[in-house]
Amino acid sequence: MKLTREEKRIKRHRRIRKKISGTASRPRLCMYRSLNAFYASLVDDITGNAILTVSSLGKEYVDATGKRGGKSIEAVQKVAEILVQKAKEKGIDKAVFDRSGYLYHGKVKAFAEKCRELGLIN
C-alpha cells in the first residue's frame, strides 16, 4: 500500500526525532505548516513543555503586519523574527532546529535561514 504525503512526512519526522532533543537551555525549534498558517514552537523535551509558541495567526503577527494568517515566505520570515525576539526576551539564545519531517526547501528553508541570520540556530 502506498503511503500518502502526510504519512511520509510523519515517518521522516519520527526518524529525525530519534536524533534531536531539546533542553531548557537549548530547546528544540519545531514548526508546522498548514494550508492557511505557519506555526513555530520552542519545546523543552525533558519536561515536555512548550516554552514559546508563535504563529501567523497570533496577535503579535497581526499587529506587525496588519493581516491574519499569512503563509508566504515573507510571512514565515516575519514569524521567525517574532519568535527570535520573544526567545531573546525569555533568555533563550540558542535552539536546535527540527524541520518536522518537511523537506528543507521553500518556506522551511526561509524560516531556518531567518532564524540562523538572527542568531537563534547555528
From Swiss-Prot:
GO cellular component, one term: cytosolic large ribosomal subunit
GO biological process: translation
Keyword vocabulary terms for this entry: Ribonucleoprotein, Ribosomal protein, RNA-binding, rRNA-binding
Molecular function GO terms recorded: 5S rRNA binding; structural constituent of ribosome
One Pfam family here: Ribosomal_L18p
InterPro entries in alphabetical order: Ribosomal_uL18_bac-type, Ribosomal_uL18_bac/euk
The protein's role, per its UniProt record: This is one of the proteins that bind and probably mediate the attachment of the 5S RNA into the large ribosomal subunit, where it forms part of the central protuberance.
Subunit (UniProt): Part of the 50S ribosomal subunit; part of the 5S rRNA/L5/L18/L25 subcomplex. Contacts the 5S and 23S rRNAs.
Recorded family membership: Belongs to the universal ribosomal protein uL18 family.
HAMAP family the UniProt entry points to: Ribosomal_uL18_B
NCBIfam families: L18_bact (TIGR00060)
Name by which UniProt lists this protein: Large ribosomal subunit protein uL18
Organism of derivation: Hydrogenobaculum sp. (strain Y04AAS1)
